[in-house]
C-alpha cells in the first residue's frame, strides 16, 4: 500500500503540480480533501479549492517545475520533500510580476485513503521565496 500511495503523489506532482492538468484533481483527491496551510486556520477545501490553488500558482509561475528530492511512506501517510523552480510572471498573493526566478524547498505530508488524498500539510520556505522576489529583507 505504501508504494501505491507514493505513486499517487508522484502522479499528482507530474500531472497537476508540473503539468497543469487540473482536471486530474478529481481523480487524485477526495471530495472533502483539506489542505492545511502553514498559517493556522488557513485551509483549502475540496477539489475545486485545490484546482483554484494550482491554477493561481501556474498563472503566477507558468514555468514552475517541482522535483521530488525524497519520498517516504508509512501506513496511510506519504512525505514528499521537493524543490521547485519558476519565474514570477503573473500576480502572486497580491504581488505584481517581478520576472524573478525562484528556487524553493518544501515538504508535503499527505494522508491517503482509498487511493486518494484526504488531507495534506504542505510546508515550504515562504520567507526564502519572498526574499527571492524582493518582497522581504
Give the location of each predicted region:
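C-terminal and inter-domain tail/linker signature
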Residues: 1-137
Amino acid at each position: 500500500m505504501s508504494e501505491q500511495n507514493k505513486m499517487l503523489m508522484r502522479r499528482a506532482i507530474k500531472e497537476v503540480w508540473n503539468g497543469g492538468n487540473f482536471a486530474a484533481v478529481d481523480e487524485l483527491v477526495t471530495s472533502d480533501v483539506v489542505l492545511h496551510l502553514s498559517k493556522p486556520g488557513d485551509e483549502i477545501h475540496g477539489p475545486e479549492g485545490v484546482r483554484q490553488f494550482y491554477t493561481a500558482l501556474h498563472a503566477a509561475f507558468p514555468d514552475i517545475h517541482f522535483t521530488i528530492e525524497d519520498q517516504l511512506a508509512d501506513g496511510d501517510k506519504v512525505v514528499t520533500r521537493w524543490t521547485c523552480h519558476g519565474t514570477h510572471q503573473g500576480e502572486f498573493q497580491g504581488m505584481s510580476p517581478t520576472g524573478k526566478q525562484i528556487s524553493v524547498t518544501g515538504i508535503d505530508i499527505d494522508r491517503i485513503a482509498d487511493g486518494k488524498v484526504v488531507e495534506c500539510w504542505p510546508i515550504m520556505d515562504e520567507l526564502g521565496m519572498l526574499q527571492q522576489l524582493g518582497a522581504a529583507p
